[in-house]
Amino acid sequence: MNSIEFPLLDRTTQTSVISTTSNDLSNWSRLSSLWPLLYGTSCCFIEFASLIGSRFDFDRYGLVPRSSPRQADLILTAGTVTMKMAPSLVRLYEQMPEPKYVIAMGACTITGGMFSTDSYSTVRGVDKLIPVDVYLPGCPPKPEAVIDAITKLRKKISREIYEDRIKSQEENRCFTTNHKFHVGPSTHTGNYDQELLYQPSSTSEIIPPETFFKYKSAVSSYELVN
């Protein structure tokens, strides 16, 4: 099912010795043992729970759910992310060791869903908080779609160069350990906006309460971002 190919792993000699690179060997070991941290806040997470049963058996992909972010290399977000829960999500992502990956599952996680038009307390896309590797649309996505998303992530890992990923994340960081929110231009790229750096509380602009109600359209020029 959607076999993953390594171009450098098929060079064998007559003595059955495989020649490869350390990067490909590292990718192969990581994609075969993804340990997810399950971050479910709404009904989409119920569909992921179906994968634990014998019908879909997600253990065959090496997935071992963990309850600690320090033991996980994949965080799967499912459901609505509110402004109150956003700092907790960012903190969990920061505590995960490198390299780490994110799957956004469901319409509410990707765009805010039905709450994106008139809710002042909903994050309109989890990619405004953390970088997303795989988007899984649906309301809710079926278990088969979750398996397909995991397979696509494994393919991405197999073609990845570790040094390039670390460099890209270092150049696109906008969150800090104190997780303060402020008003700034919305981003839709899945990366951290370099211009939206956190300012100390002594110099940061005070956000009036009416700001939360002013910018509540689905596509607006300003969003609450981290």
Swiss-Prot record:
Keyword Plastid tagged: yes
Membrane-topology descriptor: Peripheral membrane protein
Annotated catalysed reactions: a plastoquinone + NADH + (n+1) H(+)(in) = a plastoquinol + NAD(+) + n H(+)(out); a plastoquinone + NADPH + (n+1) H(+)(in) = a plastoquinol + NADP(+) + n H(+)(out)
SUPFAM superfamilies membership: HydA/Nqo6-like
HAMAP family per record: NDH1_NuoB
Family assignment from sequence similarity: Belongs to the complex I 20 kDa subunit family.
Name by which UniProt lists this protein: NAD(P)H-quinone oxidoreductase subunit K, chloroplastic
Record gene name: ndhK
